[in-house]
Amino acid sequence: VRRVAHSHGIEVSFSPKIVVGQAGSGMHFHTRLMKDGVNQFSEGAGLTDVARRVVGGYLSHAASLTAFGNPVPTSFLRLVPHQEAPTAICWGDRNRSVLVRVPLGWQNLDDRMFRDANPQEGPVGELPNDSQTVELRSPDGAANIHLLLAGLTVAARIGLSDPAMLDYATARYVSGDASKHEGLDQLPSSCAAAARCLLDQRADYEAQGVFPPGLIDAWAEQLFALEDENLREELAADRVLVEDLVARYFHIG
C-alpha cells in the first residue's frame, strides 16, 4: 500500500490518530468459532450461548488486550468518547458505540432476497449461517497482531470455560449510545494503564504456556517506557506537543 501510494506522491499512515478532535483509524477484528465446518455463533435467529460466552471472555479481558491492540500513545487519543471509537466495556447488536459489536449476519433467512434479484432462477433453499461474527472494535493499526490474536484466543477460552461468563456478558449488553450508560467499566487511557491491566491478568495469559512470563514482563516494560500516563492532560495544554506526537507515530503498522 505504501509503495503504491508513494508512486502517486501520496503518504499513507496506519496511525490510530493524526488529527486530534476528529475520528481516528481503527483495525477491527471479526471473529467466529467453527466446529466441524459449522459456525457456532449462530443458530437460527440471534447469537448462541457459545457466542455470548466468547463475548464475555473478550469483555472480561478487554482492558488488558489493549496492551497488544493499542500499544502506542496515539492509540489512546483515538479511544475517546464521541469520536466513533469505543471507550466503555460493553457489547451490543449493530451498535457502533460499543466495544464488541454484533454486525448484521444472515440469520434465519431463506432465499427470498436471491429470488427477488434473480426471478428466473430456481429456489436455492435456506442460506448458510456461517457469516455471523462478533467484532472487537478497540484495536488499531499499531497493534501487534500476533500477540493480539493469541490474547483473543486466551480470552475466548476463558469465556467458554468459566461458567460466569454468560451472565457477565448479559450484564454488559447495551442498546443505544454506550456513553449514556453509567456504571460501565472503561478502557485504559494510556499505554501505562494498559500495561498495569496486563500485569493484573498475566496469570490468564500465561496459563497453559500461551504467553511466556518473560514476554509479559518485556511487553509491559516497553509500554511503561513510553511514559504516557498523563499524556491526555499534557496535550490539552500544548498544541506543539500534539503535532510532535502525531509526527513521531505517523509511520507505524
Question: Each predicted region: which residue ranges?
Answer:
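Active-site capping/gating regions of soluble enzymes
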Residues: 2-164
